[in-house]
Curated annotation (Swiss-Prot):
Localization, UniProt: Mitochondrion matrix
Protein name as catalogued: Mitochondrial zinc maintenance protein 1, mitochondrial
Keyword Transit peptide: yes
GO terms under cellular component: mitochondrial matrix
Family the entry assigns: Belongs to the complex I LYR family. MZM1 subfamily.
Principal location listed in the UniProt entry: mitochondrion
Role this protein plays: Assembly factor required for Rieske Fe-S protein RIP1 incorporation into the cytochrome b-c1 (CIII) complex. Functions as a chaperone, binding to this subunit within the mitochondrial matrix and stabilizing it prior to its translocation and insertion into the late CIII dimeric intermediate within the mitochondrial inner membrane. Modulates the mitochondrial matrix zinc pool.
High-level lineage: Eukaryota, Fungi, Dikarya, Ascomycota, Saccharomycotina
Organism (species): Debaryomyces hansenii (strain ATCC 36239 / CBS 767 / BCRC 21394 / JCM 1990 / NBRC 0083 / IGC 2968) (Yeast)
Signal peptide (UniProt feature, chain positions): none
Length: 119
């Protein structure tokens, strides 16, 4: 692998696991072990393109962990406290406002058919 880019991707991945799983030590350690194993498995890639693909994939995984993984802690009863952080990507809920027919789901397709029958 390209040493400098690979080392940067490795460090970013470790940072991402710390952000995503900081309160869950077993999951944090498992994620870091998985990342290390992935780098060990790919350390002998000879093809430059394969190296770049592996590094880019790891960078994408790191971004996904940071932006999309939120740990939750069970509170009393059936309540959970979600540990959002400043880099968590929050949706704008625009899809919730769309009708099912506009979203293109199977239910929407049936709803569209049903509305055509009614006319």
């Amino acid at each position: 692998m390209s040493n400098i880019r690979a080392l940067g991707a490795y460090r970013n991945a470790l940072r991402a696991t710390r952000v995503a799983f900081k309160t869950d030590l077993p999951v944090l350690m498992a994620a870091r072990t998985q990342i290390k194993q992935g780098f060990v498995d790919n350390k002998d890639l000879a093809d430059q393109e394969q190296q770049h693909e592996a590094i880019d994939k790891m960078n994408e995984v790191s971004q996904f962990l940071i932006k999309n993984i939120v740990q939750g802690e069970k509170q009393e009863g059936d309540k959970y406290f979600l540990n959002f952080h400043e880099r968590t990507e929050l949706g704008d809920n625009e899809t919730i406002k769309q009708s099912k027919a506009e979203m293109g789901s199977l239910a929407g397709a049936r709803a569209k058919k049903y509305s055509n029958i009614k006319k």
